[in-house]
Every structure is written in structure tokens, then in C-alpha cells.
């Protein structure tokens, strides 16, 4: 949980991380405000299991409920997904991947033994994200929430699934 700005500043100073570095990496806004203050933090990994960005869930009623790192030299929201470090291995072993809406969905499925789950950090699943997952499996199960946003997102997935370069089997389950 990112609550203590003083400790964070001390860490940055000790590790020679400048405000410019933090801004380029999407941790502070252009006016110098910490973007992830008072949030539960979720590290967003690359497919090589390096942390490239963060998502944050507000722990109070101030600001947006969820906030993701801005696009940076390391992170492009339309290309990256949220998953745990076991995602690729589990996806290859099970032969399929779950795509769910959010961070807590991924963590809940992991706890149940489904480390083959990932999230676009919302409902805006893109062609590029589907293409990335298709490198590890040809079977993708879309499990968005059974609300208006989830249903619309499912329709968008059905529209873009034929653009994937590989033969991919996509099933949509609105839960």
C-alpha cells in the first residue's frame, strides 16, 4: 500500500531516482503529484516477468477508484496485461488462458489454482493484447462481468477476434 510519501521520497533519493525518472515511468504527474498515493498497488509485469508499471486501487473515496500507470517507455496499456509471474507457464500447461476484467479477478483465480489468468485492467481488451496471449495458447476464455460494460466489451472482442494472426479459439463467458 502506497501511503507514506516521506518513505517513498527517501527510497528514491537513496537509489538516485529523480523526479524526471518518476515522471517518465508514470509515477508522478506533469505537475509533480504522486499518482498512486493511498492506493493498493498491483505490479504490472512484462511477459519476461519484469515490473513495468503499476495499477492502484483507491483505499479512500478520493480520486478515481482505479488508476493505472501512464504509458511510458516500458509500458503501453493497449499492449500489456496484468497477470502474475506464473501466467505463461500455467497457460502453456493448462492449454488455455482466462481474460478477466480486473486485478482482484486475476488474484482470486490464482488463489483457486488458475494462474493462467490475465486482465487488461478494465474492459478495454485490445487486438494487441489478444495477439500477445495467442503466443502462449490458441484457446482464450473471456470472462468479463455480467454488467453493461462487460457485455459491451465482450461484443468488441467478438468483433476483433478474427484479426488475430494465429488460429485462436475464443469463448466468451459473462459471469
Give the residues covered by each predicted segment.
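Conserved alpha/beta enzyme-core scaffolds, especially Rossmann-like or related mixed alpha/beta domains
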Residues: 1-3, 174
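Phosphate-handling DNA/RNA-contact segment within nucleic-acid enzymes
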Residues: 5-136, 153-154
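Conserved phosphate-handling catalytic cores of large alpha/beta enzymes
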Residues: 125-126, 134-175
